[in-house]
Structure formats: structure tokens, C-alpha cells
Amino acid sequence: MTVSLQNVTRSVDGIPTIRDVSLTLERGTLSVLLGPTLSGKTSIMRLLAGLDKPATGRVLVDGKDVTGIDVRKRSVAMVYQQFINYPSLTVYENIASPLRVQGKSREEIEKRVQEAARLLKLEPFLKRTPLQLSGGQQQRTAIARALVKGADLVLLDEPLANLDYKLREELRTELPRIFEASGAIFVYATTEPSEALLLGGDTVCMWEGQVLQVGSTPKVYRHPETMRVAQVFSDPPLNIVGIQKHSGSVQYAGGISAPASGLYAGLADGAYRVGFRAHQLEVANGIEGHHAFSATVTVTEITGSESFVHLNRDSSNWVAVLQGIHEYPPGHVLDAALDPNNVFVFDAADRLVAAPIAFSSEVRSGSREENASKKPSAM
């Protein structure tokens, strides 16, 4: 089965929410819609489901135009942020509800509910009602109900957003196994780059109703075609600094000059913008082959395992991530270093012209993105 969007557009109250989007989804694949709030992720899902109609363009299933076909006539299931279950029914009955609507036999219902319960680790809770479950168990019930339906297209709209951190991390690690066990097309919406990396599959990078880049998740992460894609796929935010390349040297905004080594050596003379993620900025002095800076601490966020140090240099705001607990008072001046082989370089049109030479050197041990990308299916 193949589901396609062809040049679809949509507006709400005169405001464009989808701008000329084309997208093809194949059976047995996972596509992660990654973008900030209001980037168009939910709008894309509603078009795929048949809940909304595009103003222009078509929705195709195996080449057949289904743009005007009602959602009830489509093989689609959807899981939302909210825990949408029937409160008066047990977990068993919640999972079984779409099968009863389909008129399945008692034996078939029993078989499929038990299979879904095993897959979602809900077997001990089948006799409970949703109010007797944790948030994670409630969302597992909703996912089980979507899977047991046997839909060809399963849409998950930020399904973990309303869970606490521990439950969210637990389900994140289980979802790839659940997806792999099904032959459906899965579309998963998230605002979090780390979630996209953990899930693997393909990433559809979105911004203001447009699809900016589509590709395997590691490829989009390592080789963003534009600065905007790099920004969407960076958490903490992408650090950016302007440079001027001339002959054998580069001058950073703020007046620091350095040899045009590493990736800079192959650039034509001119102006560029350099992007680097938080784990690419070293808080250290005198690292051989690195370009040295000094920057002023504005705030330090301590998460327990990591410290995010916010820095200001010549009106540029940067973030560095350090392992462990580091407390720097506001106003403290730190030495920082940047590896010229380990940056993204963008031209005047913000198109990528150079990426880190080796991904293995791009991500440091313990960083958010590295931990996520260690999942085998994301490599």
C-alpha cells in the first residue's frame, strides 16, 4: 500500500497551514513529522486521515484519488496527545471496541486483543478501567486499540506529549518494537529531535506548513540541506555565528581571526554562516587545531546528568552542553573552543555547503542527540 499527498494546500481562516506539500508513504515504513508547534504536522495528519480536505491537490491511495472519501471509509487509525479511552469500559473492552464495530467473531476478538495486550504489555491490566491506569498505561491502551483495528495507516499525533518524563522515555524505547511488529504505515508527529532519532525511520522536517527536507533520520540530522532544517533538528537551539573567508584565514563575527583550516579550507572567499550544536562547542582552552573564543555565562541549566551553559558573545547567544553538574554564575567568562572540522557551513542563501567530516567526531559521549542516535535502526 502507498499513500501520497500531491501538491496539497490548506488554509484555516485565511491563514495557510499547508503549503504545496507532496509526500509518499510506503507500507511497513515509519515517517516522523518533525517541526515546532504550528508547523503543519497535525494538518498533514488530518489530510491523510480524511478528516479535512485540501484546498488544492490530491490524496492518493495506491494511485487512486481518495481526496473526498470519508474517514469512516478509510483504513486509518489515529492516536492523539490526550488519553482518549472509554472511561466506563475495561482495558479489554476498549481494545476490543473497533473489532466489535467490524463485526468480528468472539474468537477473533479474543485472539487479537490478547496479541495487542502482549505487544503493549497490558496483560495484567485488561480487567481495569482507564481511571485505574497510569498515564503511560492509558496511552498504551489507546495505541493497542489503534493497532488491533488492523488499519493500513496509523497516525500518532505527539502521543507522548502529555506523559511525565519517565513514562515518556519508557514508551519511546518500546515504540520502535511495536512499529516493527506491524506492517502498517506509521506517521508520528513530534517537536523533539531526540524523539525522531530514537524512533528512526524517515524524518519529514516541517516549518510553517512546508516540507523542508525528507530522508532517513540520520541523514537529515547529519546533513541538513538548509540552516532552517538544522535549527529544527537541534535541541538545544543551533548555535550560529557569521564568518568571512579571505585567502588563508577566516574572521568570525566579533573580530576573532583564525587560520582557514578544516572545513573552511575548501570554501571560496566570501561570507558564510556557521552552525554548531551544543555538544560541538567545547568549554576548554588551548585545544590543538580548534578555534578559541571567550564568552560570558548568562545562565546555567542543570538537569542532573548534564549542564546546559548559555553563553553570550558579541550579541550572539550560544549553548554548550557539559557532562555532570557545573555551576557558573551569570557574568562568568569562559574559554570555549570550536573544531573547524566539526561545524555546519551555510552560504548566503542558508544552503549547506559543508558538514562535519565524521559523524563519530560530531557527537560527544552523553549528549542528548548521541544517546538517541545509538539506537541501531537510526544508524
PLM feature segments, named:
Residues L34-P36:
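The feature captures the beta-strand-to-loop junction immediately N-terminal to the Walker
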Residues T42-M45, T141:
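ABC ATPase nucleotide-binding domain helices that frame the ATP-binding cleft
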Residues A49:
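Helix-to-loop junction immediately C-terminal to a conserved catalytic motif
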Residues A55-R58, E208:
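Conserved coupling/switch loops of ABC nucleotide-binding domains, chiefly the family-specific signature
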Residues G57-D65:
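Conserved ABC transporter NBD signature motif
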Residues S75-A77, Q81, N85-R228:
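ABC ATPase nucleotide-binding domains
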Residues S249-I357:
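Non-catalytic connector elements of ABC transporters
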